[in-house]
Structures are given as C-alpha cells and as structure tokens.
Amino acid sequence: MTPACPGCGLKLAHVDGIAPENYAASPACWATYGELTAYNMQRADPGFLHQLAVDAYAAQHDGPSSKAIATAFGLIGLYLTFEQGFNGREVQHAHAVLAGSRHDWPRLAAPPSRGAMTVADVMAALEGDERDDRLREWARQVWLAWSEQHAIVAGWLPDPQRLKRPSRWGPAHS
C-alpha cells in the first residue's frame, strides 16, 4: 500500500507515476481518476456527466499547490449542478464565460474532510447507471463537505441562470 492520498485519503497499491502538482493527489488516486475519465469519455453522454467528476475531483483534491481558479471552478460547478440544476454541458459553458470575467479567484479554507467517498468508490460501481449514480453521490458528498463555503461560492454568481446557455443537450443530469 502507498501512503494515503492527501486530498481524499484513498489508500491503493503503489502505482508508478506522478500526480500533477496542482492537485493534492497520490499517483494511485490520479490514475484511478484517469480511468474514470476514460470511461466517461467513451460513453458520449449528451449532458456531459464527466464535468461533475472534473469538478468533484478538483474540490476534493485542493491543496497548497492548487491554483485558486481550479478549486473555485470545481466548487462553482458543484454549486451550479446541485443548487441550480445545471447539467455538465451547461456547467462547462458557465466555466468558459467565467474564465474571462475574473482573474483573481480567492483561495478558500478547505474543510478538514472533503467527503467519505473517493473516485475509487465510483469506479467500484457497475458500469452504466450504477456508476453514474455513484459519481453523483461522490460529487454531492464533496459539495456538502464544503458547506461552510457555500454562501461565498453562491455570492460569486449573483445571477447564475444568466450563465445557462439554452440547452441543446436535454434534461439536466444531476
């Protein structure tokens, strides 16, 4: 076993490689996230559920070397999904709009625990609906773990619905 992942606490067998320094992640955790990414990309989900994985991973793996924008956008994506009903494509569009609007995203104090579930819990679920549901639950736990920061995140977006492009992708997948 390798040491626990600094972001989520996941303990997996050693994996050669490194995790990007802008995430507080172990190589094994990062490799598992890569497996989830590959799985999600081959599914071609029109609502782009994978955006929820991107945002949950960024928020759960915030660390001293993380870029403030990565954690902020992770939390914004979770807020837009769980509090505003956006699907992944709509969150992706909101991120694109917000990226050009501000350059000084603040660093928030991370909670001591960022959810009991990890990306490995998502990958342990059966492929298909069960894994999708597990991904949503993981992301929801990460969002709830940051509850002390919810008002700040909501304050960054005084009119979140203006960020919602008319959907061509069907109903939200949250």
Language-model features, listed with the residues they occupy:
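Intrinsically disordered, low-complexity linkers and terminal regions
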Residues: 1-174
